[in-house]
C-alpha cells in the first residue's frame, strides 16, 4: 500500500497512526484500518454497509461504473460491508465509531444492522475493540463532528 509506505518512510509506527473519516469516508477509513494493522480508526456517522446506503441511486451508479453490473459486485461483499471485510481479512482494527442519535438513517440503516451482523463474526481471531460513541445533536443529523471536535478527539486517541 502506498499509504503504508509513506507512513513507514516518515518513521511513524502504525500504532501511532489514526485514520479518520466521516460518512463514506468513514467506511474507507475502516477498510484502510484493516490493511494498516495496528492503526486506529475514527469513523463518524459512517456507512458500514454501502449496499444499504440511503442514497441507493448512488450505490447503483458505483456498482455499474466499477463492476459493470450488480452480479459482478456481489462477488465482492467485503468491498461494500465492513463486517464482510473483517471476516475476509480475519482482522478488526481498533475503531472509535461516533454516531449521532439524531440521524435516524444512520441508526436504522447502518448501526443497527452492523451490530446484528457483527454477532455472526465468530471465526475472526485478530479482534480489537470497537467503541461506539453515541451523541445527541438534533441540528446536525448526519453531519459529522466539527473540525475542532474531530481534531481534539484524534489527539485523545493518539494519547491513549
Q: Locations of the language-model features?
A:
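Alpha/beta-hydrolase active-site loop
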Residues: 1-12
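Alpha/beta-hydrolase fold nucleophile elbow
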Residues: 11-23
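Short coil/turn segments at beta-strand junctions that form active-site/ligand-binding loops
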Residues: 15-16, 39, 93
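Glycine-rich nucleophile elbow surrounding the catalytic serine of serine-hydrolase chemistry
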Residues: 21-31
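Residue-level signal for short, function-critical loop segments
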Residues: 23, 47, 101-103
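Hydrolase active-site cap/lid region
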Residues: 34-70
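The feature captures the conserved acid-bearing segment of alpha/beta-hydrolase catalytic domains
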Residues: 58-133, 142, 151-159
Amino acid at each position: 500500500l502506498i499509504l503504508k509506505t509513506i507512513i513507514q518512510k516518515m518513521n511513524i509506527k502504525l500504532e501511532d497512526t489514526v485514520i479518520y473519516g466521516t460518512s463514506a469516508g468513514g467506511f474507507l477509513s475502516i477498510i484502510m484500518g484493516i490493511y494498516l494493522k495496528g492503526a486506529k480508526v475514527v469513523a463518524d456517522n459512517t456507512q458500514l454497509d454501502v449496499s444499504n446506503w440511503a442514497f441507493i441511486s448512488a450505490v447503483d451508479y458505483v456498482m455499474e461504473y466499477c463492476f459493470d453490473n450488480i452480479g459482478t459486485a456481489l462477488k465482492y461483499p467485503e468491498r461494500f460491508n465492513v463486517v464482510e471485510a473483517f471476516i475476509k481479512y480475519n482482522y478488526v482494527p481498533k475503531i472509535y465509531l461516533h454516531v449521532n442519535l439524531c440521524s435516524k438513517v444512520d441508526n436504522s440503516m447502518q448501526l443497527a444492522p452492523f451490530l446484528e451482523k457483527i454477532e455472526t463474526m465468530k471465526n475472526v481471531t485478530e479482534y480489537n475493540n470497537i467503541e461506539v460513541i453515541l451523541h445527541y445533536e438534533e441540528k446536525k443529523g448526519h453531519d459529522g463532528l466539527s473540525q475542532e471536535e474531530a481534531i481534539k478527539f484524534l489527539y485523545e486517541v493518539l494519547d491513549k
